[in-house]
Amino acid sequence: MKTTYQGSCHCGAVRFEADLDLAKGTFKCNCSICFKTRAWLAPVAASDFRLLSGEESLADYQFNRRVLHHRFCTKCGVRPFSQGDGQLAVRVNCLDGVDPQELIDAPVKYFNMRHDDVKSPPAETRHL
């Protein structure tokens, strides 16, 4: 069942809300940027995401094939969400007031994007 979550960057300049069902799953990836930032994400349909404030505080980082836009707050540096190529995902650690038990119970799928393999998880995931 979807729940509407409020979310923000660390300084609060960027605020959003997203209708998510964390019980349907979250994901972690071992690509270079997700690994370096320890990203833990939840997919969200574009129609279920609303940027409430802070568009002017957002900057964009792209790399490699330049498909995804890794949006980050220019004031505090936090990346609350990524979007592009028909995808949108929010960082679960940017959800304000989320019950820790919901995060504990949320299934996590692992993607081996370091080797461009979306079908098989990495051999080791404890460090992600």
In which residue ranges do the predicted regions lie?
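A short Gly-Trp-Pro
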Residues: 1-8, 13-128
